[in-house]
A protein has these predicted regions:
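N-terminal carbohydrate-binding accessory modules
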Residues: 1-39, 60
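Substrate-binding/catalytic cleft of secreted carbohydrate-active enzymes
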Residues: 36-42, 46-253, 257
């Protein structure tokens, strides 16, 4: 159990990218504020800044509106899926520098209640020359007040929380119980197509144990872009990948929980 102001912490959260259909990855202040206000109206109380720090205005709004933030380091670890040793000598110093930047930038932000070492870290036990454990230790050595999250690393990696992406309801239920590590779903219920239909079952499992810290749905708003097409009078949404003509990208349009 994690306690804040005498009350158990329970994330009813969402992952959030900096994205806008018109402005792309430049997000104006009014979009930030609309995001936070809409989250509050949806009974969302937490944001995982996937997968990097945001503009300082987001943290100001999180403080203002009373939102919890999982402060995530700008570290994408898909490259280590197979423990690629040639990558390690280049990746580790760069990633440790980003870890330091994340900490120094966010350490005084009231809304940041948990550190996250980055994204997709469960594919390997500890790739890139002990990178994961060193990132975890960096935060723990400098901040004893906030728990540290690192997906899939668990107690052996030195984290304060157990965590998975997209576990089954049964797996979540198995994680609940007295004496077990605090557990959080850093991503679940991918809101794509005909999805998000079993939130009740997930939350029945989450609420069944005092060690459960809640969950962050993937994800907040669609990452598509509004573009015009020849001979068509309206704008159409595509992903910001290489080309909307790639069939595998079609399914990423309108991949979100919010239609604001």
């Amino acid at each position: 159990m994690v306690i804040i102001n005498g009350q158990p912490l329970l994330f009813k959260g969402t992952n959030r990218h900096d994205t806008d259909p018109v402005y792309g990855k430049y997000v104006p202040k009014d979009v930030y504020e609309k995001d936070i206000e809409t989250m509050k109206s949806y009974n969302i109380n937490a944001i995982r800044t996937s997968h990097y720090a945001n503009d300082e205005y987001l943290y100001y709004l999180a403080d203002k509106y009373g939102m919890y933030v999982m402060g995530e380091t700008n570290a994408e670890c898909h490259a280590l899926m197979w423990d690629q040793d040639p990558v390690a000598q280049y990746l580790k110093p760069l990633t440790m520098d980003r870890t330091n930047t994340s900490f120094q930038t966010l350490k005084n932000q009231t809304s940041v209640v948990m550190w996250s070492t980055g994204n997709e870290m469960a594919y390997t036990t500890n790739g890139a020359d002990n990178l994961y454990t060193d990132m975890i230790a960096y935060f723990r050595d400098r901040d004893t007040t906030r728990p540290v999250h690192s997906e899939g690393q668990g107690r052996n990696g030195g984290t304060d929380t157990d965590s998975n992406m997209y576990p089954t309801v049964g797996t979540v239920q198995d994680k609940a119980g007295e004496g077990k590590m605090p557990y959080v779903l850093c991503e679940y219920s991918h809101a794509m197509g005909n999805a998000v239909g079993n939130l009740k079952e997930y939350w029945d499992a989450i609420r069944s144990g005092s060690n459960m810290l809640g969950a962050f749905v993937w994800d907040w708003v669609d990452q598509s872009r509004a573009i015009s097409l020849d001979n068509l009078p309206k704008n159409y949404s595509i992903t910001d990948k290489s080309s909307f003509l790639q069939q595998e990208q079609f399914i990423f349009c309108y991949n979100k929980i919010s239609y604001e």
